[in-house]
């Protein structure tokens, strides 16, 4: 599927691109049209400061979250453990957990995680179709699995989630709805919305549409904002769950472009966003904007295209563009601290992959 292929697998992308170099995206059809943003009122270039670690652990550091003087980094392709906890801001290794393997206590994959507190770290294993909750102790240098929530088979292969006080929010990957509310037993209890495409597409290609619209999501319980950014194209959705409003925005690159072949979606536009963080006032997102035909050209020249995004886009909670940061390093995951004006980011292109930016 598109999303599994795109995240962290340049070899898979290359094979797909070479195989689809002659196909084009879906044809525009009359339908709903959403607002566009084209520029940001403020732009600024910022430079990375490399964080020096006392241990070499990472193969593909994809996500990072800092909370309660602890930083947790998720490594998408680690041979041993998917998660690594450090003290913060000193970055001393505490413990690695989420052992990779096929055993009952092990994980087949790690798509993302949510760090709520030291005893509430939720991790999503799409291949096992389960969410596990972990607790870590800096004092004991330990991590223990507290519970496992097995997801209903009707959710197919969930690739992202947000945990709220009452349920999980999980995107729908069949294309019938936009996302599900899922109870803490793993059962879907309510479907919400539809994919906000501007194209008039046949119902039989909805699974391909859902693949193309694979989104990264975040939820802020303080303001009730759930936001999604697409991995392909340049589309943003903002659900205000307290006011029951839904905002859709397209950037200059528009919605995800794809070609449907036998019900499967093949990307033909750009790599879009790679992470999203919602604070009390703003929405931060990492943006790539690299065209697939440029990636294909790089592979055909025998070169490896850059992996990651060099932009952080900032929107207010209503979707108005506020700030565009241009980075001197390509990044994937971000953690935002507005009080200290600090961005912690992961970079898969560097041997020193944890970086800090000041905004």
Where does each model-flagged region fall?
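Short, small-residue-biased leader/transition segments that mark boundaries at the very start
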Residues: 1-13
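A short helix->beta-strand "capping" segment at the edge of beta-propeller domains
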Residues: 34-58, 320
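Structural signature of eukaryotic scaffold interfaces centered on beta-propeller domains
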Residues: 62-65, 111-116, 158-164, 208-222, ...
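Beta-propeller blade signature
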Residues: 87, 181-182, 300-318
